[in-house]
């Protein structure tokens, strides 16, 4: 079966986000009332797996092996069956 994966990787609280800070500052300079901005990466993948649980497990492995740095990143995984 095919599964659609959406993985969002973002910095853990307490880690500096220079790109987010710059974005917030520039938006304020443009007149927007932005207090904070956080930059994250989003991955959209199509994966073949035997079950939704297997797809979730493989997505976790991908995050731990490549997509996220466990020292500084948190991630959210959404798995849906492709129709």
Where are these regions (language model features)?
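Long, contiguous binding/interaction regions
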Residues: 1-44, 50-83
């Amino acid at each position: 079966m095919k599964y659609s994966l959406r993985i969002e990787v973002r910095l853990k609280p307490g880690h500096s986000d220079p790109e987010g800070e710059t974005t917030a500052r520039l938006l304020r300079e443009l007149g927007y009332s932005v207090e904070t901005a956080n930059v994250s990466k989003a991955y959209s993948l199509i994966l073949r797996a035997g079950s939704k649980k297997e797809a979730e497990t493989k997505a976790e492995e991908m995050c731990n092996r490549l997509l996220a740095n466990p020292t500084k990143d948190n991630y959210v995984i959404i798995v849906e069956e492709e129709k």
